[in-house]
Amino acid sequence: MKKTKFSFIYMGLLAVFILVGVGFIFFYDKDGQTAEIDQELINKTPGLATMLSVQDLLQTQLLDEHLVNIEVQQENKKDHVTVELGGNDHATIESLLKDTYNIYTSANTLTDLSALTIIWSGTLKQQNVTLMKVSFTLEQMQQLPSKTFYDIPSLASLYEKNNELNK
């Protein structure tokens, strides 16, 4: 009889422990705490908010596999963002200019930017090379919606393309 009483108490305590553990797992507010930590991290790290905004913008404009690297440099309390993107094997000057135009016209609303540089990397003749490099200041980006993607080479503060592209 003593053995049964001990087993009953032991099983009861075990059941209470399991219920408390499961309840804690299901009802613990992980998302709220994570959001608070993320916001603290964003406030403490200069350029992180801009980098996350640019990353979100790129995810809406391009497929995820295009994004290779994002770097943020502070210039006079504004952020100069350099984005390296991977072009596909069939990239043309026109397709890269169209994608670049779409990114820049969306990025002109990011007020913390001082400049945005986009570097397209890819493979030409079985070698990894820079296909195109384009840089715009925020003021130049704000002029783009009234222009076309063909105007990018003449409007950009920096425009370089690989001479082997489209040969």
Model segments located where?
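Hydrophobic membrane-insertion alpha-helices, especially the h-region
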Residues: 9-25
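N-terminal, intrinsically disordered, polar/charged segments of Gram-positive cell-envelope systems
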Residues: 25-80
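Second-shell loop/turn segments in exported
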Residues: 41-44, 84-95
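Short, flexible beta-strand-to-coil junctions
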Residues: 1-2, 88-89, 110-111, 119-125
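Short, non-transmembrane amphipathic alpha-helical segments
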Residues: 91-114
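Intrinsic-disorder-associated interaction segments
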Residues: 43-47, 51, 89, 134, ...
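Polar/charged, Gly/Pro-rich intrinsically disordered segments
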Residues: 57-82, 113-167
